[in-house]
Design a protein with these regions (language model features):
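C-terminal beta-strand-loop-alpha-helix "lid" module of Rossmann-like NAD(P)-dependent dehydrogenases
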Residues: 1-292
């Protein structure tokens, strides 16, 4: 059995650790609420932009096909994955699950554009598919960061450097679980952007566009993709904070259990020491009486 002094030191050490895990839980909770609020603030804008594109797409000519819809019929298309990981650890298996999902779906010739320090460090000089000069942080997603990534993605797609671009991120399924998902950014799915039919009649509706539908789509489609990336970044950041809250809550509960067990052991140790001292005192007193 460990000494009372050593047990007391262990209890104090675990109590200090528990204060840290509890503080990290509260910080992640605050960041989660703020990130969700920021996303809700801009969601109406991107929702309206999505509705606008749905009204524009039916008016686009079938020929020539807009480059954003062009499916390049290649045997080995050049694919890129924009991967959203975290800047920090201590979030359970959040980063590991995402990277495992990525490796399961990617081919040897694909390219990884990683956002987040943890994912970047995990692949740096270990996986040749990592684009090392693409380096963005994942903390506190901003519209400007999402816009910069969108511009780079569109330029690489239009120039033919890339044939397909996907976003890989962690999506919150419910209050307790989240899982990695993959969504295609480019080329866009024309059928997915078509408006839902509302009764009989032409889904194109009576809409006049100036100067033409092609130009309007050329201006609005990048904003739609910008919204896709910002939404994925925010969702991923929220999932990270949720995972960290779960991990820190579990760590705090484990610390409480350890403290409880150690306190029982500490009390038994003290009780044993006191009993031994009493026994020694009684034995000493008896010896004195016998000598007298």
């Amino acid at each position: 059995m460990a000494s009372s002094k050593l047990l007391k030191e262990r209890i104090e050490s675990i109590q200090d650790t528990m204060k840290i895990t509890n503080a990290m839980y509260l910080i992640s909770s605050s960041k989660l609420r703020k990130a969700r609020q920021n996303y809700q603030n801009v969601l109406p804008y991107f929702t309206r932009m999505r509705d606008t594109i749905s009204r524009v797409v039916p008016h686009l000519p079938d020929e020539p096909e807009h480059p954003f819809f062009h499916e390049r019929d290649l045997e080995n298309p050049k694919r890129a994955y924009i991967v959203l990981t975290a800047d920090k650890g201590m979030a359970g298996a959040y980063n590991q699950n995402l990277l495992k999902f990525l490796r399961e779906h990617a081919d040897q010739n694909d390219r990884f554009y990683v956002i987040g320090q943890v994912g970047y460090r995990a692949l740096f000089r270990k996986d040749p598919r990592l684009v090392e000069d693409f380096h963005y942080g994942a903390t506190a997603p901003t519209l400007q960061r999402a816009r910069d990534i969108t511009v780079d993605a569109i330029d690489d797609f239009k120039s033919g450097k890339l044939d397909e671009i996907y976003i890989v991120y962690t999506k919150i399924q419910n209050a307790l679980t989240s899982e990695p998902v993959m969504e295609r950014l480019l080329p866009l799915d024309r059928a997915h952007l078509m408006p839902a039919p509302k009764g009989l009649g032409d889904p194109r509706g009576e809409v006049e566009m100036f100067p033409d539908a092609w130009t309007v789509f050329e201006q609005t489609a990048p904003i739609y993709m910008h919204g896709m990336i910002f939404g994925a970044m925010t969702e991923s950041f929220c999932a990270e904070q949720s995972a960290r809250m779960t991990a820190m809550d579990s760590a705090t509960k484990s610390a409480k259990d350890m403290i409880h067990d150690l306190e029982l052991e500490y009390n038994r140790s003290r009780q044993g020491s006191i009993t031994q001292e009493i026994t020694e005192i009684i034995g000493g007193a008896a010896a004195v009486q016998n000598n007298e």
